[in-house]
Amino acid sequence: SVRPGSFKIRFRDQATGRLRYQYPYRLLQREPQSAQRKGFGAQDVILNLVPDRFANGNPDNDRIAGYADHVDRSDDGGARHGGDIAGIRAHLDYIQRMGYTMIWPTPMLENNMPRYSYHGYAATDLYRIDPRFGSNEDYRQLVQAARQRGIGMIQDVVLNHIGSHHWWMQDMPSPDWLGFQGKFVATRHARTTLSDRYAAAADRENFSYGWFTDTMPDLNQRNPVLATYQIQNTIWWIEYAGLSGLRVDTYSYSDPAFLARWSSSILREYPHFSMVGEEWSTQPLVVARWLRGYRN
């Protein structure tokens, strides 16, 4: 019932009602016919690219104050190489000539990690494009420019974990925000535990809530506030940027009940949208669990 526009969100002391903090917020207008957007399908040719390794269109963002991981092209391993949104946009005509109809970049959200930040899979802010790639508006304009050439954009989403330098880590919203109460317990990657009715509960717990690495804290989506946050975050990016689809990293590693809620929430907003999830297993019975319409 809230109309688009700017307003202040006020936070008050629950006991006294005293105003503690207020945050200026802007609610954007939805695009016309947004809910009817079409996703990608078998007819599409998808280009998967790593933005940092693709093309450097704006050398001015190679070094950003406050970001430890800078461009070093002499390091062909984990260092950043300077590719950015401007570089992708400058090559849209080339991508179009190659016959691609969808672009799937690896994650471009802020990844302010000390090292190996180029890949993007350890986000430190879920609402901000990494400034070494460009701005949120740069990203939105890239999507629009691609659409004008008949090319859609698939966003790479990470629901399972964040980076260990995410600002949440300085002051957790709640003690159960992370798997294993914020203590590093490595997942054993036992993906079959979810489909094995005889699997030990401890093994299932470890798979869904164990950390991917010690620099990628696992998110505990059994926390209802976190679950709602992630759902709203995904819908916001679809609407704000004008996305054509989602590719979800480490899909099966998140809480299974949350994944069902997340997927149904997205499809409720966008019935014709397309989403695919990463599942490493080669066993059909394990992969089948995640197919649309599968009863589990």
Locate each region found by the language model.
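N-terminal structural segment of carbohydrate-active enzymes
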Residues: S1-G152
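Extracellular/periplasmic catalytic domains that process cell-envelope and extracellular macromolecules
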Residues: K38-Q43, Q96-M98, W104, A146-Q148, ...
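Active-site regions of oxyanion-processing enzymes, predominantly non-cytosolic
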Residues: I46, D176, V248
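Aromatic- and acidic-residue-enriched segments that line the glycan-binding/catalytic groove
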Residues: R63-Y67, M113-D125, I129, L159-R204, ...
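Alpha-helical packing segments of well-folded alpha/beta enzyme cores
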Residues: D84, I88-H91, D138, L142, ...
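Structural detector of well-ordered beta-strand residues that form the stable sheet scaffold
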Residues: W104, I154, S274-V276
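Active-site-proximal helices and loops of the catalytic beta/alpha 8
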Residues: V143, H161, H166-M169, N233-I235, ...
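Active-site-adjacent "subsite" loops/lids of carbohydrate-active enzymes
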Residues: M169, S174-A241, Y251
